[in-house]
């Protein structure tokens, strides 16, 4: 997916949230804390990487996020952040 650095998608959480809607509820749930708490604070390169990540197949994302399958190297830090943010959400919101 070709993404321009000046693409307005990077500045709109609503557009990203819409793009992040997946066909699997589990993915929606794990991506939401990252989107709500981290995305807008990321630099442009990381925002661009997340938008690229969203073009992945749901089955691949599920494997990387839930089954521990090794993702492409460029996504490893992002996936670690997504999982960390979900754990933080669980600790604070699900008590």
UniProtKB/Swiss-Prot annotation:
Its main location: cytoplasm. InterPro entries: SDH (IPR005631), SDH_sf (IPR036714), SdhE_FAD_assembly_factor (IPR050531). The keyword Cytoplasm applies. Keywords: Chaperone, Cytoplasm. GO terms for cellular component: cytoplasm. SUPFAM superfamilies: YgfY-like. Coiled coil: none annotated. It is found in: Cytoplasm. One of its GO terms (biological process) is succinate metabolic process. Belongs to the SdhE FAD assembly factor family. An FAD assembly protein, which accelerates covalent attachment of the cofactor into other proteins. Plays an essential role in the assembly of succinate dehydrogenase (SDH, respiratory complex II), an enzyme complex that is a component of both the tricarboxylic acid cycle and the electron transport chain, and which couples the oxidation of succinate to fumarate with the reduction of ubiquinone (coenzyme Q) to ubiquinol. Required for flavinylation (covalent attachment of FAD) of the flavoprotein subunit SdhA of SDH and other flavinylated proteins as well. This is FAD assembly factor SdhE. It comes from Francisella tularensis subsp. tularensis (strain SCHU S4 / Schu 4). The lineage of its organism: Bacteria, Pseudomonadati, Pseudomonadota, Gammaproteobacteria, Thiotrichales.
């Amino acid at each position: 997916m070709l993404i321009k650095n000046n693409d307005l998608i990077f500045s709109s959480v609503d557009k990203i949230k819409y793009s992040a809607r997946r066909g699997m509820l589990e993915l929606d749930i794990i991506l939401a804390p990252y989107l709500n708490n981290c995305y807008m604070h990321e630099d442009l390169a990381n925002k661009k990487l997340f938008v690229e990540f969203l073009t992945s197949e749901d089955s691949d994302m599920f494997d990387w996020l839930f089954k521990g399958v090794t993702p492409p190297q460029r996504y490893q830090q992002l996936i670690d952040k997504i999982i960390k943010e979900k754990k933080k959400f669980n600790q604070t919101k699900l008590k």
